[in-house]
Design a protein with these regions (language model features):
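Short amphipathic alpha-helix that is part of the acyltransferase structural core
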Residues: 2-66, 82
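Conserved donor-binding loop and adjoining core beta-sheet/short helix segment
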Residues: 40, 49-134, 156-159
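Polar low-complexity intrinsically disordered regions
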Residues: 1-14, 18-19, 86, 106, ...
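Conserved active-site alpha-helix within GNAT-family acetyltransferase domains
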Residues: 121, 125, 129-177
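Phosphate-binding glycine-rich loops and adjacent basic patches that engage nucleotide phosphates
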Residues: 2-13, 27-34, 46, 84-94, ...
Length: 177
């Protein structure tokens, strides 16, 4: 795997934090029907990831037990896109990871048969907006200037070393290795 991609708030006005300022919500593509992702979706989620991994051929395979762990984190937000037959074709998840600093971890996949339609890029925009919201929620109620209010926050994801398409999407958003 390649190094973790991410950015801190220090990235300035050209980094991904600049696109996280308040504004219109991302529009998820209308090719799919979108709904919140929940633990009840785990079977369909594991099947989607298996389809993607069979094409992408990472050096591992994700099990349904592992995808069930996505929902263990107390603070997460996810969305699933389904086709007209109800088959999950894409998902995106943002989780706040416990650490000394705030880490919003992004994970998602688009079914190989539904790629190159703008779904992945739209999901990344959705994820960065959700990350901003979750980080803001984490800081809500903290006294101004307190450690809780000023703890650095990062938006991160991992990318397979040879996944040039994903690296390009992330680069377009200002993320860097």
């Amino acid at each position: 795997m390649a190094p973790v991609y991410g950015s801190s708030r220090r990235a300035g006005v050209t980094g991904p934090w600049s696109m996280l300022r308040p504004g219109p919500r991302s529009a998820l593509p209308r090719d799919l029907f979108w709904a919140p992702l929940s633990p009840l979706d785990n079977g369909a989620l594991a099947a989607l990831i298996a389809r993607a991994e069979s094409v992408d051929d990472p050096p591992y395979r994700t099990t349904a037990e592992e995808t069930a762990e996505y929902f263990v984190d107390p603070t997460y937000s996810g969305v699933a896109g389904r086709d007209a037959l109800g088959v999950m074709r894409a998902f995106a998840l943002v989780r706040l990871r416990p650490a000394g600093e705030i880490y919003a971890s992004l994970i998602g996949v688009v079914d190989p048969d539904f790629r190159r339609r703008g779904i992945g890029g739209a999901l990344l925009h959705w994820q960065t907006e959700r990350a901003r919201h979750l980080i803001g929620t984490e800081r809500a109620g903290a006294a101004p200037g307190s450690k809780a209010a000023t703890t650095p926050a990062h938006v991160v994801t991992t990318v397979l070393e040879d996944d040039e398409r994903m690296k390009e999407h992330l680069g377009d958003l200002g993320f860097e290795p």
